[in-house]
């Protein structure tokens, strides 16, 4: 494989010295970009974009052609695993993801297969290898998956949910059944991420989007325990260099110390944490990624720069910080404002790395 021309993202995750703070954005390939909307129209729909390696590669690279980002992230969806388990993923306009089959009994869980990444999710592996080849060493490629808890909520609720009542009821009424589901998902995520690493992903992130909706005790039992299991089973070195792992629990700021003990290299932070406080709590153990409120991108350019400067100052001097948003960039953001954000990170962070 081609040598990396820009490895500051990987270096920051491993707390090695960098010249400026690296930056990328969750959902950087997305609807805020006119070129993405054109590709999606050409593909027909969202799943056709995901399942065609050429389209997935095209949209992954679009933000890199527009901005000086320090990483690319595979264009895919967290729900590819439940889809490969036979649940029948589809997207309802205005409602988001739905499943044709819903998990409601222990028998449903017993019947679920653990997908083979090559056979059942080969289109994702092909997308990873295609993107990696096309990147040609420009920046590292991030692979990703949803966390077992987050995937389980969609599988049990049948789609998005405001209160996760069915999944939480299962946690209290029939914890053995939920643990069986989470265990199958942990096995699936481990092999899926390892497949992505072997196909060319140079770092991986686990998105625990709904872990922050649990009580402290339930978070430990039903979310963090399974992420810990995944981390312990991941390939951590490939192609002669370390493969960093990032854990991101949205609304997980109360539990940073526990998450930092899970064995990952970095923690993703949402915007409700103060990054300087997070560094004081866990920064000797792990790198930190985040954490500007994505809605700041609706503000004027000078306000965006001011908030970037504030977050950089909060983190302070030295490496171990990857700048990102605290969640995904939203569709109505002006692409020019995203550019202001990315350029501000590079320009204003140099003083912290002298």
From Swiss-Prot:
Pathway: Porphyrin-containing compound metabolism; protoporphyrin-IX biosynthesis; coproporphyrinogen-III from 5-aminolevulinate: step 4/4. It catalyses: uroporphyrinogen III + 4 H(+) = coproporphyrinogen III + 4 CO2. Transmembrane segments: none annotated. Substrate binds at residues 27-31, 77, 154, 209, 327. InterPro entries: UROD/MetE-like_sf, Uroporphyrinogen_deCO2ase_HemE, Uroporphyrinogen_deCOase. Its EC number is 4.1.1.37. Pfam families: URO-D. Its main location: cytoplasm. The record marks 77 as: Transition state stabilizer. The keyword Membrane does not apply. GO terms for biological process: protoporphyrinogen IX biosynthetic process from glutamate. GO terms for molecular function: uroporphyrinogen decarboxylase activity. It is found in: Cytoplasm. Keywords: Cytoplasm, Decarboxylase, Lyase, Porphyrin biosynthesis. It is an enzyme of class 4 (lyase). One of its GO terms (cellular component) is cytosol. The keyword Chaperone does not apply. Catalyzes the decarboxylation of four acetate groups of uroporphyrinogen-III to yield coproporphyrinogen-III. PANTHER family: METHYLTETRAHYDROFOLATE:HOMOCYSTEINE METHYLTRANSFERASE RELATED (PTHR21091), UROPORPHYRINOGEN DECARBOXYLASE (PTHR21091:SF169). Belongs to the uroporphyrinogen decarboxylase family. Homodimer. This is Uroporphyrinogen decarboxylase.
